[in-house]
Regions:
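Polytopic transmembrane helical bundles with strong interfacial aromatic enrichment
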Residues: 1-183
Length: 183
């Protein structure tokens, strides 16, 4: 079975990558708080939803597939996620900081802000320190002809499990955000 030709920088993938970033830039530059809040909620909710889906649903489906099919799925998923998820995560976090600043609740002596910061650090380390490097490794393996399917499966499944574990922290930060908005 030949490996698929992987194109990361297609028009649609760049559009998917840039849309959240451009929305954030517009919201900040226009000082449109409602739109900024929308950008934060939609990117954060999408990030959480994707991680929930990956961790709870896709992990079970992928475990049940033959290794060859699992590798094929991961090889198709990775190039899309390589651009999309960092864009979503970065925009959700940045929009959240802007919102907290605009609401004058970004106070580093506030235990809820400290807890949010700790969770954001954990999520960032997982996303940018574990998941993204694994996606780059998978992508490079695909570009080399995808001969090492075992490596692709191992790294891909690790990412699926880490995505699933992120949901715990995302639910915690959603709870903290609800406390912050209520007062």
């Amino acid at each position: 079975m030949s490996s698929p030709q992987v194109k990361v920088f297609t028009f649609s993938s760049l559009l998917i990558f840039l849309t959240p970033i451009l929305a954030l830039i517009y919201a900040v530059l226009s000082r449109n708080f409602t739109f900024l809040n929308y950008v934060h909620v939609i990117t954060g909710g999408t990030w959480t939803g994707i991680d929930l889906f990956m961790g709870l649903i896709m992990s079970r489906i992928l475990r049940s597939l033959e290794p060859q099919l699992r590798a094929q799925f991961i090889m198709r998923l990775t190039p899309l996620m390589l651009l999309f998820m960092p864009s979503l995560a970065s925009v959700a976090i940045t929009a959240g900081v802007y919102i907290a600043t605009w609401l004058h609740i970004f106070d580093l002596s506030n235990p809820l802000i400290i807890a949010s910061g700790i969770i954001v650090i954990i999520l960032s380390v997982q996303g940018f320190g574990i998941i993204m490097p694994n996606e780059v490794r998978i992508f490079l393996e695909i570009r080399r002809g995808a001969k090492n399917k075992e490596k692709i499966n191992k790294l891909g499944m690790r990412n699926i499990y880490v995505s699933g574990s992120q949901v715990i922290f995302q639910i915690a930060i959603i709870f903290i955000m609800s406390l912050l908005t209520v007062g």
